[in-house]
Structure formats: structure tokens, C-alpha cells
């Protein structure tokens, strides 16, 4: 009783000096209510503090970034105003289309992919596919082109897909970077679950890339498409594939394709090396410099089909400087002595036997696996049989297949004058402001003095377009420049030459792809509200006769010449870029928010791919139910599931009950 009195007294003291929060009239009595304030706990104070830090930090970062971009746009404007092109003439584009395609109507294909990876007990299922939106574009004088799509995409559309079921314990035999494989470089800091093994696998990604490239290749070979669009960077994809296949020490041990000897599909390590850089110019050669020198000699000997002396080789490759001739001599002598690529007899060099047919056998290999993955019903597409029995293809095999398919696509597009275009969203590239512009300013190609800006090309160009909207009309594009500039920097100290390579002093192949940044749309009501800047790179064709720079690069003990493509200003005519910009602008759609300033055919291809992935996902789930209910497999189903998954399933069932 005493405790209740004490508590009541305490409550009276608390509210005696406080105004009532509200009152209520009940049965002739007025009841007053007080809301007693709660003392703040340590947890609530901590949440409040974190919220304050988050609010102030976010405001500060956004404000600082905006101010930095505003200053950068003003600083870069004197240079960028010379590089932004807004004058695209539909009449000239129609003339270019007629010269390039032989007609004012061209057929296009936009290719995109999707993937799915699921775990059914102990069985992993990897699905991936690529699908295309196709149609025609008709160019007109003094008017926008007319776009027409083929109908019934889901029923009659073009697509490729493949599915690979594989037990989780076999994934390390396929996935080189798996923590369970001998080549894995990850440290296992905790228990590795089956689900994490499947989630971290890249098998579906490799199959999706292979399907996208192979589908694009089939369109190029079909002699129907004049424009092929891919939802990825062409130069970035090729560079990544070259990097993924660069560790020659792994080839013999990890490439299952090297063990295939039947049906004329046998390849050896030298065949792989020969076909890796199979991206020659229209004359059949690579630039005779850097890492491409030996391959340039290989393709020259393949083209001439006869032995050549050292003088004949250097003459046909236009290598005249003493240091470059000596470097070429060292390469050839060492390779012939080690029986790699070349044989020497009486001072003349020739290709080793079978290398002259290496590219044809490589293409046959790609077509074989393309049919196996996407057309054949003969068993698991990722498993082959050699003299030693069944063996899994590895991700290194898939990387080689993707690289060779891309080389085949490039070769076919150049031969048939097809526009091959890559469209990349949300790029973080910064080579224009860190490589191209500083180099051109230092060589007095463009005037100005510009310091480092900690942002990306896309963000800077979006800021310039917004802050200078009165002077920059939409659509616009930067001038096109060689993707080799991504690896070209100003010369290092104590290095002869005009430039150096960004990584290990290497410069990638020039005159293969050119790139630009574009902005395609804006709001009707607000001129400053504009679409995102896109990164576009495309295959360069030698008939364009683009302007180039002559740069000296010291590499491998010789001063070599690099000739990257660069349209120096918006006033330099570029008819193919104009045709592409008119095409891309016609493929936008203002009324669909998801593709504001983007590409409608690629958007449709993405929707087709996602719809097919949804069907595949349901099929995979159905197969899981079939496995656990099949009379002959039921006794194995218990052990297919891990303890964790089985416990989780039982707990969920009990909770629902």
C-alpha cells in the first residue's frame, strides 16, 4: 500500500506544474490527460546522432560535388565547346546511308542478354541467353528516319539460350576463380555454403556473353543486317577478354578444348596464340609495334603464303628505323630458335606447319560450340568427351570462345561494311579528361591549361550540358577518338618519345574502335533537364580515311610509331558519325521514361530477354519439384539438400502453420 502511495505522489509531483495535454468529458466528469515525456535512451541518442551525421554529410558531399562540377564545367568549356557537335543533317545522313548500305533503308538488330543461376538442393543450374529486337530504319531527306519493328518478338523473335546443370562440388572444375579450385585466389575466412558458391560463380555470365556475341555474329553472317547494336562496350569487352586469356601458363592445364582431337577440331597452344589478336586491318595486318609485332609478321606470312627474308618482311611492314629492324630481327630469331610460330631456312622465314589454317580451324571450333550450346540436344553443353573420358569446359575455355567469336564478328562486319555499335549506360570512364585532353593540350592541338578534375567523363559532360544549355543543343556528341587513347598518357620521365602506355607501358591496338559521348534528349518544358550522357564505341572501317596523329612510343628497346584516330574539332567532317547520331536519335522515345535519352531497340531486347528469363526461372523451379517427387530419385533428394536449407524449409513451414 505504501508503494502505491509513493508512486501516486511521484506522479502528482511530475504533473503538478504541467498543463494537461487533453481532456475528455465522461458521465459528468472531466478527465484530464498528461503525456509524460520519456527520457532519451542511449540507443535513441545514437540513432539521432547517426541521422544528423548522415544528413549533414550527404548535404555537404552533394553541395561540394555540385560546386566542383560547376567550376570544372567553366574551366573545361573553352576546350569542350570545340568538341561538341550538334549539327546533324538528315539529308547528308541519307546520302551516307545510300553510299554505305546501297539503299536508304537498312535493317537493324539490337542484342541484349539475361541470366539466371539457381540452387536446387546440391544441383546448380546456370541459364543464360541473348535475344534481339529487329526492324528497319528508313532515312529521309529533311526529316527524321522512320523506324519499323518486326512484330511478335516473343513468338517469332531471334534468340539463343543455353542451360547447364552441374553439381556444386563440380563447379571448381569449371570456375577457375572458385575458392575451392586450385587456382582460386580467395581466402576462405568462414564456412563456404553451396549457395555462396553458386552466387559467386561467373558461369552464367560467360554463357550470356557468348550468346550475345554469337547471336550478333549470326546476324552479321546472315547478309541482312546493316546495323548491329550491343548493350555493352566493344573495346572494353575485347580488352577484358584479352586480359582473361593472357596467362599462357594456364592454357595447357586448364583448356579442355586443347584435348579435343576429333572432327578436325584440334587446336594447340600456338593456334590459340595465333587467333587471340585476330583483328587485322583491311589490309590483313596489325600495326607492327609493341605486342602486335609478332602477330603482324604472322598475318603477313599468312597473306603472302610464301617465305620472306628479313628485308622483305621489314619492307612490307614499313619498318625502316634501325632500332625497330633490330627489334624485329630479335623477335624472329628467338621465335624460330624456340620453334614458336616461325621456321627459318636459308635466311627466309615462314609460318610453322598448320598455322596457316589455324584461323579456319578456330572458327570451326567456335561454330561447333555455338551449335552445341544453343542448338544441339546432345547432353550437357559444358561437358565434352576426350580420350581420357568426360571433362568439363572451364571458364578459360569460355573466355577463349567469347574472344574468338568477337574476332569473327569484327572480321565479318568489316568485310560486309556493317555498323557495329556498342551502347554503354552509366560509364565511369575518365580517359577523355585524364588522357586525351591533357595530351592534346600538351601537344598544342587544343589551347588551354587544365588541371585534374576528380570526376568522370560522363558527369563532367552532363554538367557542361546543363550549365551551358543555351549554347549546347540536344542531341549532341563529342568528336570521335580512338579507344587506344584509353591507354595513352603523356610520356614518363626519362622516356624517349611523345607518349607512354598507361599500364606496363602498353598501348592497345589503334584504328580498331572509336568512341564518343552522346546526349540524345531533353525535357520539353525545362531546357536544363536533359537525359543521361551515354558512352558509344563502334567498329572503325578503313574506308572512312579518318585523320590520325603520329605519336612516338618507346617500347621494347625501340621508338615505334602509334597512329591513333582523332577528329580534332567539330568542324572536321565525320559522315559515319553523323549517320549514327541520326540513327540513335530516331531510336529514342520521349513518352517512355525508362528510355528517356536511351535506345528503344535495346530496351525492347532487354524486355524480351527478361521475359524469357522469367519463363526459364519457372521451368527451373518446376524441375526442382520434379526431382524431389520422382519415385526413382526420391531417396537421393534428402541428401541433395544441405542441412541449412532443410532446416530453413522446416522452420518456414512451421511458421506458416
Whereabouts are the PLM-identified features?
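Short, Lys/Arg-enriched, disordered terminal segments
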Residues: 2-3, 39
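Intrinsic-disorder-associated, low-complexity terminal segments enriched in Asp/Asn/His/Tyr and depleted
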Residues: 3, 8-11, 21
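Polar low-complexity intrinsically disordered regions enriched in Ser/Thr and small residues
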Residues: 5-6, 16, 31, 138
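Long, contiguous domain-sized segments
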Residues: 14, 21-95, 99-101, 162-171, ...
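Short hydrophobic beta-strand that contains or immediately precedes a catalytic carboxylate
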Residues: 108-111
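Compact, glycine/acidic-enriched structural inserts
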Residues: 134-198
Amino acid at each position: 500500500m505504501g508503494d502505491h502511495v509513493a508512486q501516486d505522489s511521484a506522479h502528482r509531483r511530475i504533473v503538478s506544474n504541467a498543463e494537461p495535454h487533453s481532456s475528455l468529458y465522461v458521465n459528468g466528469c472531466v478527465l484530464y490527460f498528461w503525456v509524460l515525456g520519456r527520457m532519451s535512451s542511449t540507443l535513441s541518442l545514437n540513432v539521432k546522432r547517426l541521422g544528423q551525421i548522415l544528413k549533414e554529410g550527404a548535404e555537404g558531399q552533394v553541395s561540394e560535388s555540385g560546386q566542383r562540377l560547376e567550376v570544372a564545367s567553366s574551366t573545361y568549356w573553352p576546350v569542350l565547346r570545340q568538341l561538341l557537335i550538334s549539327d546533324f543533317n538528315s539529308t547528308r545522313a541519307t546520302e551516307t546511308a545510300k553510299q554505305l548500305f546501297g539503299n536508304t533503308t537498312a535493317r537493324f538488330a539490337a542484342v541484349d542478354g539475361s541470366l539466371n543461376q539457381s540452387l536446387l538442393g546440391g544441383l546448380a543450374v546456370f541459364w543464360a541467353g541473348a535475344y534481339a529486337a529487329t526492324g528497319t530504319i528508313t532515312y529521309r531527306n529533311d526529316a527524321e528516319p522512320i523506324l519499323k519493328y518486326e512484330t511478335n518478338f516473343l513468338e517469332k523473335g531471334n534468340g539463343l539460350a543455353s542451360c547447364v546443370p552441374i553439381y556444386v562440388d563440380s563447379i571448381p572444375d569449371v570456375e577457375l576463380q572458385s575458392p575451392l579450385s586450385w587456382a582460386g585466389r580467395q581466402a576462405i575466412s568462414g564456412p563456404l555454403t553451396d549457395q555462396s558458391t553458386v552466387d559467386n560463380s561467373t558461369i552464367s555470365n560467360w554463357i550470356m556473353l557468348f550468346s550475345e556475341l554469337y547471336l550478333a555474329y549470326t546476324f552479321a553472317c546472315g547478309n541482312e543486317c546493316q546495323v548491329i547494336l550491343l548493350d555493352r562496350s566493344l573495346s572494353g569487352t575485347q580488352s577484358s577478354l584479352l586480359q582473361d586469356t593472357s596467362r599462357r601458363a594456364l592454357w595447357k592445364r586448364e583448356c579442355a578444348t586443347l584435348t579435343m582431337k576429333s572432327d578436325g577440331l584440334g587446336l594447340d597452344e600456338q593456334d590459340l596464340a595465333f587467333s587471340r589478336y585476330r583483328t587485322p586491318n583491311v589490309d590483313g595486318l596489325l600495326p607492327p609495334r609493341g605486342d602486335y609485332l609478332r602477330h603482324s609478321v604472322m598475318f603477313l606470312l599468312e597473306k603472302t603464303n610464301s617465305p620472306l627474308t628479313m628485308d622483305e618482311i621489314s619492307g612490307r611492314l614499313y619498318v625502316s628505323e634501325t632500332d625497330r629492324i633490330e627489334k624485329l630481327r630479335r623477335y624472329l630469331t628467338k621465335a624460330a630458335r624456340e620453334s614458336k610460330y616461325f621456321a627459318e631456312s636459308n635466311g627466309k622465314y615462314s609460318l610453322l606447319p598448320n598455322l596457316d589454317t589455324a584461323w579456319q580451324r578456330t572458327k570451326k571450333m567456335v561454330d561447333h560450340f555455338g551449335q552445341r550450346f544453343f542448338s544441339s540436344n546432345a547432353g550437357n553443353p559444358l561437358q565434352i568427351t576426350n580420350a581420357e573420358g568426360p571433362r568439363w569446359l572451364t571458364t578459360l575455355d569460355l573466355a577463349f570462345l567469347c574472344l574468338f567469336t568477337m574476332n569473327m564478328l569484327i572480321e565479318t562486319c568489316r568485310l560486309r561494311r556493317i555498323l557495329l555499335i556498342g551502347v554503354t549506360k552509366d560509364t565511369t570512364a575518365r580517359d577523355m579528361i585524364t588522357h586525351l585532353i591533357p595530351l592534346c593540350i600538351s601537344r598544342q592541338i587544343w589551347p588551354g591549361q587544365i588541371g585534374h578534375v576528380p570526376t568522370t567523363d560522363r558527369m563532367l559532360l552532363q554538367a557542361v550540358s546543363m550549365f551551358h544549355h543555351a549554347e549546347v543543343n540536344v542531341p549532341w556528341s563529342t568528336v570521335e577518338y580512338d579507344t587506344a587513347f584509353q591507354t595513352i598518357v603523356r610520356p614518363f620521365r626519362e622516356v624517349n618519345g611523345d607518349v607512354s602506355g598507361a599500364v606496363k607501358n602498353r598501348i592497345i591496338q589503334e584504328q580498331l574502335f572509336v568512341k564518343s559521348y552522346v546526349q540524345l534528349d531533353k525535357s520539353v518544358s525545362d531546357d536544363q533537364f536533359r537525359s543521361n550522357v551515354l558512352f558509344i564505341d563502334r567498329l572503325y572501317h578503313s574506308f572512312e580515311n579518318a585523320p590520325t596523329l603520329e605519336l612516338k612510343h618507346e617500347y621494347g628497346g625501340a621508338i615505334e610509331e602509334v597512329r591513333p584516330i582523332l577528329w580534332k574539332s567539330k568542324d572536321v567532317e565525320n559522315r559515319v558519325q553523323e549517320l549514327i547520331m541520326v540513327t540513335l536519335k530516331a531510336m529514342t522515345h520521349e513518352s517512355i521514361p525508362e528510355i528517356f535519352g536511351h535506345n528503344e531497340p535495346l530496351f525492347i531486347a532487354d524486355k524480351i530477354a527478361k521475359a524469357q528469363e522469367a519463363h526459364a526461372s519457372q521451368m527451373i523451379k518446376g524441375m526442382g519439384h520434379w526431382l524431389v517427387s520422382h519415385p526413382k530419385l526420391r531417396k537421393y533428394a534428402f541428401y541433395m539438400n544441405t542441412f541449412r536449407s532443410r532446416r530453413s524449409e522446416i522452420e518456414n513451414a512451421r511458421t506458416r502453420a
